């Protein structure tokens, strides 16, 4: 976890944290750093960064649940970026992501392992069990999550979410 009060990492980059920044949840600490680098070049700011590693104790779903249950519309970031290697509890992800979106949040996510090569890479990295790509697509669509396929796309979509709505 990294936020305005705690930086529990040993590598760079460590971004400056801002209350109005993006919440970022990653299934991989190393991949999180690559995504942070991409985001910083676009001027994207962070409110918090969470890495759940191989999700043996908690996964992306539990962090989303925590954010949903404790959401403060005045103080909390309304933009969430997710890098997911496996979805262990799709119902939990659907419920809490949908709830956050109804509360005014925007969520963009990469689901790693959408190709055969990607499935092997995710499995060898964290032991992730591959989810069906069509099931992931349906889950994201139903929840309202914007699906991305690269770190550049993820950080670009999150950057777009930060723009003020044109009326």
Q: How would you describe each model-predicted region?
A:
Residues 1-167:
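Catalytic-core regions of core metabolic enzymes
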């Amino acid at each position: 976890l990294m936020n305005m009060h705690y930086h529990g990492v040993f590598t760079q980059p460590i971004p400056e944290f801002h209350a109005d920044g993006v919440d970022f949840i990653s299934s991989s600490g190393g991949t999180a750093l690559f995504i942070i680098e991409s985001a910083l070049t676009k001027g994207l700011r962070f409110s918090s960064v969470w890495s759940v590693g191989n999700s043996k104790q908690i996964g992306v779903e539990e962090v989303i649940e925590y954010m949903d249950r404790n959401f403060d519309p005045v103080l909390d970031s309304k933009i969430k970026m997710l890098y997911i290697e496996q979805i262990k509890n799709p119902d939990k992800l659907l419920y809490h992501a949908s709830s956050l979106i109804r509360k005014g949040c925007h969520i963009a996510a990469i689901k790693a392992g959408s190709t055969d090569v990607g499935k092997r890479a995710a499995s060898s990295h964290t032991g992730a069990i591959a989810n069906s790509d069509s099931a992931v697509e349906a889950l994201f669509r139903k929840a309202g999550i914007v699906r991305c396929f690269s770190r550049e796309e993820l950080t670009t979509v999150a950057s777009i979410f930060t723009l003020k709505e044109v009326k």
